[in-house]
């Protein structure tokens, strides 16, 4: 595997995983809020 591929893909993978992490945290908070309001 060429090192240039790693250099190009690493920031994309990091950004994608960070976005998924933030979206999952927000979704869990919203689910908790919905459960407590019932």
Swiss-Prot record:
Any GO molecular function: manganese ion binding
Cell compartments where the protein resides: Cellular thylakoid membrane
Chief place of localization: membrane
One Pfam family this sequence matches: PsbY
Record organism: Picosynechococcus sp. (strain ATCC 27264 / PCC 7002 / PR-6)
Name of this protein: Photosystem II reaction center protein Y
UniProt similarity note: Belongs to the PsbY family.
Stated role: Loosely associated component of the core of photosystem II (PSII), it is not always seen in crystals. PSII is a light-driven water plastoquinone oxidoreductase, using light energy to abstract electrons from H(2)O, generating a proton gradient subsequently used for ATP formation.
Membrane topology: Single-pass membrane protein
GO biological process: photosynthesis
Subunit structure: PSII is composed of 1 copy each of membrane proteins PsbA, PsbB, PsbC, PsbD, PsbE, PsbF, PsbH, PsbI, PsbJ, PsbK, PsbL, PsbM, PsbT, PsbX, PsbY, PsbZ, Psb30/Ycf12, peripheral proteins PsbO, CyanoQ (PsbQ), PsbU, PsbV and a large number of cofactors. It forms dimeric complexes.
InterPro entries (UniProt xref): PSII_PsbY (IPR009388)
Residue stretches spanning the membrane: 5-23
